[in-house]
Curated annotation (Swiss-Prot):
SUPFAM superfamilies referenced in this protein's UniProt entry, alphabetically: Radical SAM enzymes (SSF102114)
Entry keyword annotation includes Nuclease: no
Gene behind the chain: miaB
EC nos: 2.8.4.3
Domain MTTase N-terminal intervals: 5-125
Cofactor note: Binds 2 [4Fe-4S] clusters. One cluster is coordinated with 3 cysteines and an exchangeable S-adenosyl-L-methionine.
Keyword Translocase set for record: no
Protein name: tRNA-2-methylthio-N(6)-dimethylallyladenosine synthase
Any one Pfam family match given in the protein's UniProt record, by short name: Radical_SAM
Length: 466
């Protein structure tokens, strides 16, 4: 019997890359591959790359240097190792990757993962195996479905891609060039995927897309569903305890999405809503097509519909031309909104984007200083948000065993990790926890009540405490 070939995938960047990596594993599993945690043991290594920031791209080439050594060692052992570069760096740089790193066998963009078996066969015959086109067919219709065993092994939370690409063309962003124009998956395929996940133990669904709330998918009756309408449809599927979505653009928040937050307890009151800057002038240079006041109005609409809602965001400091006054406007917006969490970055020029050609670059020293000030404000807000949980009872979805024996870790509605001493038969349940203290960014508490263990793949979740 021929032993299975071993596959190692290393993903960089966004949640969609995590999802894409899982789908590549599923597709290659049908070709006889099994995963291995060690790149050096693999017959195929895939780097699933991110192109959002310069450092992410350079990390890929550093990793390829290490893999070249591993590939040479495998050859000395009489074993052939193939190396593939996938993701947004592959899409952006294409054949240049092979020129710069000849050890690479396959280069495949995000829209062509269903062609991986064919590309690997081509590379095995010594033929060029580079595909970075945007094929006409929908890759999701060709990628293999995960096995029941794979779903169960991945845990109680799962990502589901509903939308890809972006038509916003923010001047700093490469996504429209690496992921293409906006494309929404058909409603039926999404509902089928979610149903299969919940039938195999998944309790939390996170819908993902580069601009997820631009979703406009075709329903079986020919109508078009928005993201808000899709949330209602998913909420009706037995076993779905929690629904999240990411990442959103303020301009695409419509009434149906607000209504879903108002009406559906399963839609979590935590929204990642990037704004990037609080300066109208900088937002204009970024081509965000909204101002700071527009963003505040969107936040107000969410809060009016769901008073317990909280927000996270993205911020870029040091965008070309950013003055101290512009930066202070960002700090003012952060102070006005009050965030549960946020991600802050120094501006990194990406080749081919309009911002890369802008003048008036902010110095590295100023960027560092501004990032420190911004992050300090964000950290203080996050600490206050977490501290406010002490003494309250919060619902926690228990996900897995923690490092400490006898302890489980789960997530609150706001994605805060919560650690509780509890039996592992409650994994997959949402249970009330009284929060007693904090440990760095984690909440510590004790169960208020217990419930019957989830007994079987399709058993609906037992939820206590609303």
């Amino acid at each position: 019997m021929t032993p299975p070939r071993k596959l190692h995938i290393k993903s960089y960047g966004c949640q969609m890359n995590v999802y894409d990596a899982q789908r590549m594993v599923d597709t290659l599993g049908a070709e006889g591959f099994v995963e291995t945690a060690e790149a050096g043991d693999a017959d195929l290594v895939i780097l699933n790359t991110c192109h959002i920031r310069e450092k992410a791209s350079e990390k890929v080439y550093s990793e390829l240097g290490r893999l070249r050594v591993a590939k040479e060692e495998a050859a000395r052992q009489g074993r052939a190792m193939q190396i593939a570069v996938a993701g947004c760096v592959a899409q952006a740089e294409g054949a240049e990757i092979v020129t710069r790193a000849p050890t690479v066998d396959v280069v495949v963009g995000p829209q062509s993962y269903h062609h991986l078996p064919e590309l690997l066969a081509r590379a095995g015959r010594g033929e060029p195996a580079i595909e970075t086109e945007f094929p006409a067919e929908d890759k999701f219709g060709f990628l293999a479905r995960p096995s029941r065993e794979a779903i169960r092994a991945r845990g109680v939370s799962a990502f589901v891609t509903v939308q890809e690409g972006c038509d916003k063309f923010c001047t700093f962003c490469v996504v429209p060039y690496t992921r293409g124009s906006e494309m929404s998956r058909p409603v039926a395929r999404i509902l089928d995927e979610v149903t299969r996940l919940t039938e195999n133990g998944v309790r939390e669904i996170t819908l993902i897309g580069q601009n997820v709330n631009a979703y406009h998918g075709e329903a079986p009756d020919g109508s078009t569903w928005t993201l808000g309408r899709l949330l209602y449809g998913i909420a009706e599927i037995p076993g779905v305890a929690r629904i999240r979505y990411s990442t959103s653009h303020p301009n695409d928040v419509d009434d149906s999405l607000i209504a879903a937050h108002r009406d559906l307890a399963s839609v979590m009151p935590f929204v990642h809503l990037p704004v990037q800057s609080g300066s109208d002038r900088i937002l204009g240079l970024m081509n965000r097509k909204h101002g700071a006041s527009d963003y505040r109005k969107v936040v107000d609409r969410f809060r009016a519909a769901r008073p317990d809602i909280a927000f996270s965001s993205d911020f870029i400091v040091g965008f070309p031309g950013e003055t101290e006054e512009d930066f202070r406007a960002t700090l003012a917006l952060i102070a006005q909104i009050g965030y549960a969490a946020a991600y802050s970055f120094k501006y990194s020029p990406r080749p081919g984007t309009p911002a890369a050609d802008m003048q008036e670059m902010v110095s590295a020293t100023e960027m560092d200083e501004r990032l420190e000030r911004l992050q300090s404000l964000i950290d203080s807000q996050q600490a206050a948000f977490n501290k406010a949980a002490i003494g309250t009872v919060v619902d926690v979805l228990f996900e897995r065993a923690a490092r400490k024996p006898g302890q489980l870790v789960g997530r609150t509605a706001y994605l805060q990790p919560a650690h509780v001493m509890a039996p592992d038969n409650i994994i997959g349940q949402v249970l009330p926890v009284r929060i007693d203290s904090l440990e760095r960014y984690s909440l510590l508490g004790e169960l208020v009540a217990t419930a019957a263990p989830v007994a079987g793949a399709a058993t609906p979740l037992v939820s206590i405490g609303g």
